[in-house]
């Protein structure tokens, strides 16, 4: 089995044909000319453009099967992660796109469950495990026990919102216009959610046009500024976590207090996040090993063991 690690669902189209996908497309994003179009088939964790999503999945399949030569269409089995708050219409769109792209056996798994599998939690155990997966489009919060999701919340506040927060902050406070790619680099380099880190990253030097004059402007951005501009968005995630804990049955709540809450997804790499959430909720938070790929690892495990994990999927 081959895993294609694709960090970003971005496509570059030329005359309605995909010419770049994933990381290659990301390098071209915001640098295209009028004849080339950037498309993000997914928005807030669900399909926003059905045809583009189908092309994207076909591209993924082609990358995985690039060295295989056959006269026959390969029998492709797929497991696709979906937000736990997906509607039936959104779920059907994912399944249809996957089948039209060449999937013969298509299974869907909720992302918090996939994340828990990827972290290494025993999702079938009769005890409560809580997962907070902060992805690109959504933050998935769920309590899992006996192979099922007991209570959950899916919040449309995650990495993309953080990136937009940074862009808006630079416009308002520094009068600098930056693109999403630059804002994401800032987020990765100095992204933080508390103003007093033990290990402080160096300020990020950013250059961009002045909004009023279009003259080049240089600014030094500190991690404290990023913590300030992300404060409200992180606060919405805190509210979601508390909301799910309020719904959690007492016995499972006791398990969570004992074992802590597990953080996954790229957003969990924000500096100081586990500390801030621990202080807010009064329950320990643990960042998973390699949290960026937790969902990918979980879907891979589910794909390898579809016979044993059918009760986890739909």
List the model feature ranges, each with a label:
Residues 1-134, 142-261, 268-314:
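Nucleotide/phosphate-binding catalytic cleft detector across ATP-hydrolyzing
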